[in-house]
A protein has these predicted regions:
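Generic short beta-strand
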Residues: 2-3, 53, 160-162
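Structured interaction patches on ligand/partner-binding surfaces of diverse proteins
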Residues: 5-34
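Generic structural signal for well-ordered beta-strand positions
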Residues: 13, 64, 171-172
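Thiol-/selenol-based redox modules, centered on thioredoxin-like
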Residues: 32-45, 157-192
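A short beta-strand-turn-helix
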Residues: 50-75, 92-96
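Structural microenvironment flanking redox-active thiols in thiol-disulfide oxidoreductases
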Residues: 75, 79-130, 142-146
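Structural micro-motif
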Residues: 130-134, 150-162
Length: 192
């Protein structure tokens, strides 16, 4: 039996197990998946062609895909809970890594569940967020897609953040209240 775990680099950590199967008998074998403590692993999938509506100040209010907005390569998607402490804490954590995230140069798409929630967001409360952020509205169910594909148990618990790429691979997920989100994002980014 061969099992494997795909890494973000494209490499695969495989494990081969040999065993005997006897006639008329059930053979039980433990399924073992190798993991790397050093390299970023692919932990799920996400459609980079998923659509959202950028806020008007982003240049265009026409629906577009994450691929169109971010270009090829890795990107971050965050689904925000407006005026909720877990989201506020996450945004402050991200702001503390502004220089590193801007140096990385990839886009971060931060989404609100609807237009009303987007209107309640006070951007001025977070002046130090990276300039690579695109704000938008989740008009086409990105939050639900992430929750389903990543098998999140509490679909309504926000914020949700992922790092994914345009090959539809997810290498990082965070949901709800998290301490040190900015540091976790950068650790993953540096491992790519």
């Amino acid at each position: 039996m061969v099992t494997g775990t795909r890494l973000a680099s494209g490499a695969v950590l495989s494990k081969t197990t040999f065993f005997n199967i006897l006639p008329e008998k059930t053979t039980e074998i433990e399924l073992v998946m190798r993991e790397s403590e050093d390299e970023v692993q692919v932990i799920g999938n996400f459609n980079s062609e998923s659509l959202f509506t950028p806020l008007p100040d982003a240049g265009s209010a026409a629906r577009q895909s994450l691929l169109q907005a971010c270009g090829r390569g890795y990107f971050v998607v965050g689904v925000l809970g407006v005026n909720q402490e877990p989201t506020n804490h996450a945004l402050r954590d991200i702001a503390s890594f502004k220089a590193d995230l801007e140096k990385w140069g990839r886009k971060m798409v931060l989404l609100f569940l609807d237009e009303a929630k987007a209107g309640k967001f006070a951007r001025e409360s977070f002046p130090d967020l990276p300039s690579t952020i695109i704000y938008g509205i989740d008009t086409d169910g990105i939050a639900a897609q992430i929750a389903e594909s990543m098998k999140l148990k509490h679909k309504e618990s926000l914020p949700i953040f992922i790092i994914a790429d345009t090959f539809n691979r997810v290498v990082f997920v965070s949901q709800g209240y998290t301490i040190g989100l900015g540091e976790q994002l950068m650790r993953t980014i540096k491992g790519l």
